[in-house]
């Protein structure tokens, strides 16, 4: 019985919807008929005469005020639309029209299969957007105390955002802590130090951890029970405390290197001890994993210190040894540090060998991989490349390969060329980057701009060819050429990672919606009319009457019809009518 009632209601609802969709004219005439029947009880004639009398008594000042009010409202709508577009990247009116008005007008299909498919598609796209908008740690990140803080002292600007530093704190807690830290007082202090927001509190905690370790290091162990001989046993130093001091307290790279060497001595001892005990239980295994992360981090930062201090060959050797010793730790992306150091040495054959290993279709790409490959291809032809000669004779095979490599790199990250060509000013790179985003472009160009300048003609080739990439991908948010479509979320994530004084590069460049342009034009036009009418009422009245006479004249209607017919003939390419021929008998 309930099912029958439900079916009847569904049929009634569908009939009403059908009647409103296809029989709107019938409803319209019914309303007109009711108005005509009820014209006497409703006193429609009297009301119309009252309204006409009221309109006749209105002065021109009322119309001027009305026009000014509409102009003010249009201006407020324009300001709101512009703010909403800058914040969310879309028009508010357009979004409301598509999201709310379109379903009411019957623009949504009610088929359950389509709904299920769309929901699955939405979940897939959301999953893809989450993976594409993953934030990565910058493998070439600077030192806070020796580089970021010195920039703040000189300029008074903060180069790092709170969001970026919060991500670094989470990384430190993941890499440098484990569940057994509470058993060792120094590690327990450092576990709290990594969660501190105040830099001075973190530095004080690191010093406290080293002092506690120094006090507890003198443990008296009797060698023989009946003897008075004692041994002084030194406990291992806290390696993570030295890491924090090297990163945040050291004001020069040389000071940071000294602290990292002390951290290496302490971390290497902890790593060897935990390596022997890692199979004794899950607790020892977690401790060994933590000690491995600490040791790899220290060695990588020592190699970066050597690179900063000009000992590039030593840095390359340290990076190669580290990659051989820990080949599975790809989270640090040490190969990108190695590529930058090899480019500094101009060891292009070694760079090509590293690219052959890491520029694989199964491995995640980066701007360093793609643009370094493009630089090597451009190096072979850039010194002799000329756009005029290429336009006359065409591109050779080597030039075509170089152009394709540049197009591939630009498709992966379209923000990099503006920094390499110095069309946008560089800032200090953040500690975290977003693949294919503006943050990654800054991090790459900050270290690799000198390598592009060193190759003669490379920047000229990039300048002549990089914009051709966009012709191959006219809709980058929907379909890519060699990579997945460009993720939509990069702009929002980059604004969180980059400081407020930097103008975030947006791709693809959003154009102002039609609603904003229309509102701006309408607002300006009505404001101008209101001002002119208020200042010159008689002249504007004569002008309005003249315009009405022109639009209502027969000559204007004839000219408009002729222009319309001529335009139709041009578009349809209607041939002229053949002329009649007269034959004489």
UniProtKB/Swiss-Prot annotation:
Bilayer-crossing regions: 15-35, 62-82, 512-532
Glycosylation is annotated at 47
Its keywords, alphabetically, are: Glycoprotein, Membrane, Phosphoprotein, Transmembrane, Transmembrane helix
- Positions of post-translational Phosphoserine modification: 386
Q: What is its main location?
A: membrane
Q: Which InterPro entries match?
A: ST7
Q: State the compartments where it is located.
A: Membrane
User: In what way does this protein cross or attach to the membrane?
Assistant: Multi-pass membrane protein
GO cellular component entries: membrane
Q: Name one Pfam family in it.
A: ST7
**Family under the similarity heading:** Belongs to the ST7 family.
Q: Tell me the protein's name.
A: Suppressor of tumorigenicity 7 protein
